[in-house]
């Protein structure tokens, strides 16, 4: 169990690093929502990322695009490897 000095030190760390402020802003935003979201945790994740200047939807799209590109390049490597193998057999 942590002693009170350790807890105060950790609290100070969270305040100095902006964590408390960011969490407070997101929770206030959730509180002020007229239509409460069905998934409060998803709201917090999305808006916490936004408060840090991160566009979660854009990152998800970029991730999907990169996965598709990796898949296409993997297929191309496989195709070229087969061609090289066939050429080396001749």
Curated annotation (Swiss-Prot):
CDD domains: ZIP_MycBP-like (cd21937)
Any one of the GO BP annotations: regulation of DNA-templated transcription
Localization in the cell: Nucleus
InterPro entries per UniProt: AMY1
Gene Ontology terms for molecular function: transcription coactivator activity
GO cellular component: nucleus
Keywords from the named record: Nucleus
Cystine bridges: none
Protein family: Belongs to the AMY1 family.
Protein name: c-Myc-binding protein homolog
Originating species: Dictyostelium discoideum (Social amoeba)
């Amino acid at each position: 169990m942590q002693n009170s000095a350790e807890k105060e030190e950790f609290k100070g760390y969270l305040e100095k690093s902006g964590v408390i402020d960011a969490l407070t802003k997101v929770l206030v935003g959730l509180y002020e929502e007229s239509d409460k979201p069905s998934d409060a945790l998803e709201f917090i994740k999305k808006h916490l990322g936004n408060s840090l200047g991160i566009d979660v939807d854009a990152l998800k799209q970029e991730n999907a695009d990169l996965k598709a590109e990796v898949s296409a390049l993997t297929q191309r490597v496989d195709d070229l490897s087969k061609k090289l193998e066939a050429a080396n057999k001749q």
